[in-house]
Amino acid sequence: MDLTTLLADPNARTILHERARALAGRDRSADVATGELTLRFTLGDEQYALPATAAREVLRFETVAPLPAVHPAILGLVNVRGRLLACLDLRPLLGLPATKPHPAMRLLIVSAAGIEAALLVEQVLSIQPEPITLHLTPAAVAGHSASWVRGVDDRLALHLDPEGLLCDPRLTATE
C-alpha cells in the first residue's frame, strides 16, 4: 500500500495521527542551553540546582514547628526573622528516602510566584555563572515531579523550576 492510498483511508489517518501525538508527548529529550546563574545543593547523595534568582538566603536549620495532616514533604513552619515560612523536604516528592532533620542541614529560602518557602537541604554547594546545557528528561525519569523538573546538566544535577515546585498542589495545605 502506498502513502497516498494509506492517507486516503480515514481509519488509517486517525491511527497515524494518534501515534504521532503519543510519540510527540512522550519524548522530551532535546537539549536546552541556558546562561542563567544556578545554585547547586544536595539532598542525600544527589545534586540539584535551581535558578540563583529564586534563592533569597541560606540559613542553619534549627527547629521546625510541625503541622498536622499535611503532605510528608511539608515538615512544618520555620520562623525566619518574624516571618513564618513553610519548611519543605523535597525527598518524598523526588522519591528519595526520608531523613530526619539535623543541625548540620541548611534551609534554602526560595521565592517564586509570590510564594516564599524554606527548602531543607544537606548543603549548598555553589552558585555557578557559566552557561549550562540542560538535557530534558523523559517524563518517566522525572516521575510525578515532572512539572517542575527542567532537566539534567552534564554533571548530572537535576535542575528544578522553583515556580512549578512552589505551586505544586501537593504542597498546599487545604484544611
What is the predicted role of each segment?
Residues 1-175:
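An acidic, low-aromatic, low-complexity terminal/linker signal
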